Amino acid sequence: MSFKMTQSQYTSLYGPTVGDSVRLGDTNLFARVERDYATYGDEAAFGGGKSIRDGMAQNPNVTRDDKQVADLVITNAMIIDYDKIVKADIGVKNGYIMKIGKAGNPDIMDNVDIIIGATTDIISAEGKIVTAGGIDTHVHFINPEQSQVALESGITTHIGGGTGASEGTKATTVTPGPWHLHRMLLAAESLPLNIGFTGKGQAVNHTALVEQIHAGAIGLKVHEDWGATPSALDHALQVADDYDVQIALHADTLNEAGFMEETMAAVKDRVLHMYHTEGAGGGHAPDLIKSAAYANILPSSTNPTLPYTVNTIDEHLDMVMITHHLNASIPEDIAFADSRIRKETIAAEDVLQDMGVFSMVSSDSQAMGRVGEVITRTWQVAHRMKEQRGLLDGDSEYNDNNRIKRYIAKYTINPAITHGISDYVGSIDEGKLADIILWEPAFFGVKPDVIVKGGLINAAINGDANGSIPTSEPLKYRKMYGQLGGNLQSTSMTFVSTTAYENDIGKLLGLKRKLRPVHNIRKLSKKDMKNNNATPDLDVDPQTYEVFVDGEKITSEPATELPLTQRYFLF
């Protein structure tokens, strides 16, 4: 005998279903469920009197040897990803996403492709949003505490360079040479994130570059503070082509060795990741932003200029001075810093992100960026652009799915593709590492509820350890068992070059983490950037710094207020 309930009753029990819209935090963005994998009436739910009990949604006969039996099931999750906004159960096995589908007991339930057995644990995601762990590809490894801060914001992968609080690291994402790379690969064993390091890309002698790739670097960073000359860039790209690694470029702000055109002539048609493409973070003044129009440039923003607000310009001068070891008593140093801060290009940056011309967002951690705000600032830009520019094509009232898919791609799948790790991380897809973030919708983009890393809970909001229930105050982020003992290594990956992987660098250094080789990088182009691959004609007026897209001036007004801000940080 069937039982009918209202949609609001259903939603209160099992979360939203097809046609329901969910507001993201206190933004103006609404995600609408496109598909529900559930078989209505056969939902898997855990708790007293619920369906996941022996002989009901839990199969009493199966063992873990059955390939369909999950170690962990996340039930009734609303998944937001670059290519889907769906409701489903997520099966995890051996630390990897096994299946997205319908969980339960196939002996008594229809359409089950994830089996719950005696060996299965449950995380209830009814009414919650699930996303892939974020990827920050512009990290200065200045302070190891960055990792925990980033993790608690929903980031699970860091790519960049550094050796600690050295002047070189404070200014550049470089881990220079085999000795430093080996030391940092050993240090990564104690970090709760997936990690990849970039070496120093300045050397005419290819041996000095190649030895860093052999030592485990997943790419090379060419940075103006070490000399971003056309020659250095050309040699770095030659090595990158030989070893299938990425080049990250912080171009020449001072235009000493050439202008933007000379840099692009040196690049030719070879792919590279252009850091902070707007230019406030560094790069050819005033027109680095034009590089985003090239088919071989994968452009990203760093988060201090996102979104453009009434405070953005004022805070940037001091940030540039400190980060790049400049002296306020030297007029040329002041001029250097001042040349990078242009309100016109900053005002255009948000619009270029919204148009899908800029493909990624990253932090620039402690080097003009905030490591724990990549996700928050991405969604603030999305909110602000909807406020100023209206709905994107294909979106409608209470349905911002196209904009949401565009923006989530900026810190998940696109950075993964750019650095050759998209086979392992970057989306909620079968076969990928189970780096999964659960959010209460009201806190989406600001404070995750649970962080699953490699299939095990790594951190979560939890109460006093002496409390009688897990919600006893003070509620705060606490490390979980995924960060203890050998789990710290077994739940995360260290990314290395293919040549380092093939030469067993893990054995050489005694590494215990999962090592994975980066690959499929050198054939990339902008068209590989999901939902963010526009290549319009871009121009910058050299006198006024105004930005034009296909001949039309683009700009935005500075925000005076934003969502996802003070109300979330009262305590």
Swiss-Prot record:
It is found in: Cytoplasm. Keywords: Cytoplasm, Hydrolase, Metal-binding, Nickel. Ni(2+) 2 binds at residues 221, 250, 276. The keyword Membrane does not apply. One of its GO terms (molecular function) is urease activity. One of its GO terms (cellular component) is cytoplasm. InterPro entries: Amidohydro-rel, Metal-dep_hydrolase_composite, Metal_Hydrolase, Urease_alpha_N_dom, Urease_alpha_subunit, Urease_AS, Urease_asu, Urease_asu_c. Signal peptide: none annotated. Its cofactor is Ni cation. It catalyses: urea + 2 H2O + H(+) = hydrogencarbonate + 2 NH4(+). Pathway: Nitrogen metabolism; urea degradation; CO(2) and NH(3) from urea (urease route): step 1/1. Disulfide bonds: none annotated. Its EC number is 3.5.1.5. Belongs to the metallo-dependent hydrolases superfamily. Urease alpha subunit family. This is Urease subunit alpha.
